[in-house]
Amino acid sequence: ASAQEASAQKGNGWSAGIGAAWSPNPYKSYKNRAWPVPTVAYEGKSFYWRGPAFGYRLVNNEAFELSVVASLYPQRFRAKDSRDAQVRQLDDRDFSGVAGFDARWRGDWGALSGSAKKEFTGHGGGIIGDVNYSYPIQQGRVTWIPTVGVEYADAELNDYYYGVSTAEAARSGLSAYRPGNTLTPYLSMAARMQLNERWSAMVGVRTSRLAD
């Protein structure tokens, strides 16, 4: 997956820009799309708003940050967007909302981040988690950010997005399927370039190993 962003820093903690992301979809014969998305963010002393995520810092110092957060879970499925006749018989899956905690430890050794969130929009009430380590490397105007991590999703969330119910199996001809808990390791690399005092640009790639 990759993303590009250009942002203009405003006063009072505000920033704005435009970004885009693209990722191969795990659904069979599915149309993958990338759309430009305007982004707005605000960084206050305690409250922040970063695109589809809102947070409030409970602890914030040079070495550690702990926040309570609510954000969009950016996964969905539209049966009509699949070219496979059987998959087109499945029910749609919508975006979800999740809420929980984000934690981040930082120092000269890099940054260690962790999160745990629960789905609250009526899509099974599943739990997701993430643990990752990153080490920013400064080279002139460019900052490289390699990251290694692992994501967790429980059976309830996986079943909503990837399961095949008995009713769906009956009308599609697919086998009924109920996934379990999953761990998904990933690697990513991002590069951020400071163009001038007001503008910066960022691009990144990420690879994940999906569970069977």
Where are these regions (language model features)?
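Extracellular loop and loop/strand-boundary signature of outer-membrane beta-barrel proteins
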Residues: 24-26, 85-89, 115-120, 172-177
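Structural signature of outer-membrane beta-barrel channels/translocons
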Residues: 40-45, 59, 104-108, 136-138, ...
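Transmembrane beta-barrel strands of outer-membrane/channel proteins
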Residues: 14-22, 53, 68-72, 114-118, ...
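Repeated loop/turn-to-beta-strand initiation elements of outer-membrane beta-barrel proteins
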Residues: 14, 46-49, 64, 109-112, ...
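Outer-membrane beta-barrel translocator domains and adjoining extracellular loop/strand segments
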Residues: 28-32, 78-84, 116, 125-129, ...
